[in-house]
Amino acid sequence: MILKILIMIPDGIFWNNKAEEIILPTNTGQIGILKNHAPLITALDIGVILIRTDKKWVPFIIMGGFALIKQNKITILVNGAESAGTLKLVQSEAAFQEATNKLENAKSKKQYVDALFLFKCAKARYQAAKQLVS
């Protein structure tokens, strides 16, 4: 293990461990971080963080935030985080389909913004559930 990763939520520390690699969902797409990455601060979108420990990928769902990468230490501050360990693929897929329908049928700006948030959350949970199955 070569990266020190700290995920913080408003209530405190969510995850604190070492890893070999991490993939973050930034506002401009995914970014992979390996040992000796250049220093970086980036905004994070709602999505799935993938952390590789001992040749195994561990997914976490995050609700947006920021990441600081410096000297093999990654500090992640997020609005919320969930472990993907209890997700079920069938329920996650159904919730994703329902959120997609709400987004497509939104009539007002407020409905669209609310539906977009639900869509991003449902999509992240569905992606994390698929990661657990593979």
From Swiss-Prot:
Disulfide linkage: none
One Pfam entry name: ATP-synt_DE_N
Membrane topology term: Peripheral membrane protein
Keywords associated with the record: ATP synthesis, CF(1), Hydrogen ion transport, Ion transport, Membrane, Plastid, Transport
Nucleotide-binding recorded as keyword: no
GO molecular function, one term: proton-transporting ATP synthase activity, rotational mechanism
Subunit structure: F-type ATPases have 2 components, CF(1) - the catalytic core - and CF(0) - the membrane proton channel. CF(1) has five subunits: alpha(3), beta(3), gamma(1), delta(1), epsilon(1). CF(0) has three main subunits: a, b and c.
Protein name: ATP synthase epsilon chain, plastid
Originating organism: Prototheca wickerhamii
